[in-house]
Amino acid sequence: MAGPTTAERGDRQQESSGPPPARWSGTRRLRALVVLAALLVLLAGGCAWLLYGSSWLRLERVSVSGTRMLTPADVREAASVPVGAPLVSVDTEAVEARLRRKLPRIDTVDVVRSWPHGIGLKVTERTPVLLVRKAGTFVEVDDDGVRFATVSQAPKGVPVLELTASRSGSGAASFRRFGTDRLVREAVRVGGDLPAAVARQTRTVKVGSYDDISLELGDGRSVAWGSGEDGRAKARALTALMKAVPGARHFDVSVPTAPASSGS
């Protein structure tokens, strides 16, 4: 039986001399992965340099909006935002906490990055709804009962709170049970429930105890409100009573189902 010819042996040698197809394919995939990984590393490094190392994305300006009593300069100083630092490195939560701590007049603040070079501080200030006299000045109280600022002059249209209860006598029980802060919050609660027309005329809110809150209006009339409970019902009763007896000088809605008036 004849063996393979010289040509046939040569063909077989050529076929077996190259790498196996599967091995060649695996090598190409490995090279592609290495190249891809290198590109990703370069891309990540470039992004990191752009954000932290370059001068293109650094903080250059701090804008302030929403101020009323505060000035933009007050807010910028309290914020202490590091101008010149990489914008991405600014800790917006820390800036917000710093502003709220240093400026109690601020109720809320939004700190936002304004690419490529800015930080925006959007401020909402607290609004006083009551004033508490203190050593010739006035402490402003907001609608949450927070005492947030002291001013030398009373803001126009904001009633003064008078805590007429004493720590002894008839008001002592309220002080022991509720404390001053709770009584202040009850006064704020009453102020929030007042009919708009009455709220505009209110000059003084007197708190004798938890259930003895009264109002003095600018025209000399007075209102016995009682506690801060049932505020909406009391507001409706007061509105109706003032319309029914416009000449009265004193109104009592402490029991809203049985309002009363007196004086003329």
UniProtKB/Swiss-Prot annotation:
Q: According to the lineage, what is the superkingdom?
A: Bacteria
Q: Which residues lie on this side of the membrane: Cytoplasmic?
A: 1-31
Q: Which residues lie on this side of the membrane: Extracellular?
A: 53-264
Domain POTRA, which positions?
57-126
Matching entries from InterPro entries are given as: FtsQ, FtsQ_DivIB, POTRA, POTRA_FtsQ_type
- Localization per Swiss-Prot or TrEMBL: Cell membrane
Q: Which Pfam families match?
A: POTRA_1 (PF08478)
Record bears the keyword Cell membrane? yes
Parts of the chain that traverse the membrane:
32-52
User: Quick one: a GO biological-process term for this protein?
Assistant: FtsZ-dependent cytokinesis
List, alphabetically, the PROSITE patterns matched: POTRA
Against Gene3D superfamilies, the record matches this protein to:
membrane protein fhac (3.10.20.310)
Sorted alphabetically, the keyword list is: Cell cycle, Cell division, Cell membrane, Membrane, Transmembrane, Transmembrane helix
Its placement in the membrane is given as: Single-pass type II membrane protein
The primary site where this protein sits is membrane
Question: Does the entry feature the keyword rRNA-binding, yes or no?
Answer: no
Record's GO cellular component terms = cell division site; plasma membrane
Cited function: Essential cell division protein.
The UniProt family comment states: Belongs to the FtsQ/DivIB family. FtsQ subfamily.
Q: Which PANTHER family match?
A: CELL DIVISION PROTEIN DIVIB, CELL DIVISION PROTEIN FTSQ
State what protein this is by name. Cell division protein FtsQ
What is the organism of origin for this protein?
Streptomyces collinus
Q: Which gene encodes it?
A: ftsQ
